[in-house]
């Protein structure tokens, strides 16, 4: 799984880095557990769908 996520990040470095910055800014704004869980679920579902396709 780690290898797949790394390769996907390398395949789209610009879009991925922008997403990471956007997610990190949201974490800094709202550090509540519910917000963090939502972000984790969203990113995990995105990665899973990306790996499947």
From Swiss-Prot:
Instruction: Name the domain of life.
Output: Eukaryota
Region ranges (Disordered): 1-25
Q: Where is the composition biased (Polar residues)?
A: 1-10
What's a GO cellular component annotated to this UniProt protein?
Answer: peroxisome
- Name recorded for this polypeptide: Uncharacterized protein YBR072C-A
């Amino acid at each position: 799984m780690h290898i797949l996520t790394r390769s996907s990040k390398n395949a789209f470095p610009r879009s991925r880095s922008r997403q990471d910055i956007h997610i990190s800014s949201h974490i800094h704004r709202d550090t509540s557990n519910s917000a963090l869980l939502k972000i984790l679920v969203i990113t995990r579902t995105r990665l899973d769908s990306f790996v499947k396709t």
